[in-house]
A protein has these predicted regions:
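N-terminal pre-domain/capping segments
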Residues: 2-139, 155-162, 166-169, 176, ...
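Residues at the N-termini of beta-strands
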Residues: 72, 144, 243, 276-277
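A short helix->loop->beta-strand "cap" motif at the edges of active sites that frequently abuts
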Residues: 102, 180, 272-276
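Active-site groove signature of glycoside hydrolases
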Residues: 137-157, 178, 183-187
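Basic- and aromatic-lined ligand-binding clefts that recognize polyanionic substrates
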Residues: 175-208, 220-223
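Short strand-turn motif at the edge of the Rossmann-like AdoMet-binding core
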Residues: 186-187, 216, 282-283
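Substrate-binding/catalytic cleft of secreted carbohydrate-active enzymes
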Residues: 221-231, 259
């Protein structure tokens, strides 16, 4: 199957529901829909998948549903890096999702080059490298691919903004042809500077290019522990958000996350009018991965009910 056939085949998965897909919202059969739904980011299981080899990417939908009662998932491309254009593999993955009643929400894409590279040739190569993941995301029924506004830390604040906007605009145009969003996470460097990334979004000014605010990824420089205010940053990024990542590490005896005030954070999310998925991304070591996911889910459910 060539790329054109691949896109045409996957198009049937989006037809009839493209508008709903772009917002990340889904309807529940009967009952009142909560103001946000909970998804599971695959990175929450990175030790089980990457380090301990206890799970594979094909196990992920089943684990999300059977272990945690979650019916929406966010993939990490690192865990099936050589499968982006493996149609048989993607069909199997889609079949597993359908069997479990699990929706594929997005693919988090890393390792494909800097979309804001200082060299135009490398910047374009990074854009092209992401095409296969956009195609895979469409095939699986995702509404977005999550990408990085990486610049290599070359140039001034404004120069890096312009280059990131250029790469994202090019990728956004390609994703638009597929009915997909390209969304940027605050993920280190200047992308963790809320005002910088919000400025990039305004430069791009495309409806399908947005953000994925992560509650905890506001470290501009981890070596020096330079950190942007996470609440200010989230507030600055929420107007462009098409996904939200609920990062968690440690919990107190009451079940609250020690590093992030989830009530304050989710008030910001709700005030912005966001009604899509909030993805669990447990990254701590105090609890095992499964218990950390459960603790994050419980906290999200508690605060969601309080703010309803």
């Amino acid at each position: 199957m060539n790329r054109r056939q691949f896109i045409q085949t996957s198009g049937t998965l989006v037809a009839g529901g493209a508008l709903a897909s772009l917002t990340g919202c889904a309807t529940w059969g009967g009952g009142r829909k909560p103001w946000f739904e909970i998804s599971l980011a695959e990175w929450s299981l990175h030790r089980s998948i990457r380090n301990e080899k206890k799970l594979t990417n094909l196990d992920f939908p089943k684990v999300a549903k059977q272990e945690f009662g979650l019916n929406a998932i966010e993939y990490v491309n690192q865990f099936f890096m050589d499968k982006a254009r493996d149609v048989a593999y993607l069909k199997e993955l889609k079949s597993v999702c359908e069997g479990e009643g699990v929706r594929s929400v997005l693919i988090m894409c890393d390792g494909e080059g800097n979309l804001g590279d200082a060299l135009e040739e490398r910047r374009q190569k990074a854009v092209t490298n992401h095409h296969k993941w956009a195609e895979a995301a469409k095939f699986l029924g995702c509404h977005s691919i999550r990408v990085n506004a990486a610049t290599g830390n070359v140039g001034s604040f404004e120069e890096q903004q312009k280059r990131a906007a250029d790469g994202l605009a090019r990728l956004g145009e390609y994703c638009a042809q597929l009915g997909l969003n390209a969304i940027v996470e605050n993920h280190g460097g200047l992308s963790s500077h809320g005002a910088w990334l919000a400025g990039v979004m305004r430069m791009v000014n495309q409806p399908n290019v947005g953000t994925l605010p992560d509650f905890g990824n506001f470290y501009i420089n981890r070596q020096t522990n330079e950190e942007y205010d996470r609440y200010q940053g989230t507030e600055e990024l929420m107007p462009f958000a098409k996904g939200v990542s609920a990062k968690s590490h440690d919990f107190d005896e009451a079940g609250n996350e020690k590093n992030t005030d989830y009530r304050r954070m989710l008030k910001i999310v709700k005030k912005a009018g966001y009604r899509g998925y909030v993805g669990i991304e447990y990254e701590g070591s105090g609890l095992n991965e499964y218990d950390g996911i459960r603790a994050t889910k419980k906290l999200l459910e508690t605060v969601r009910a309080e703010l309803a």
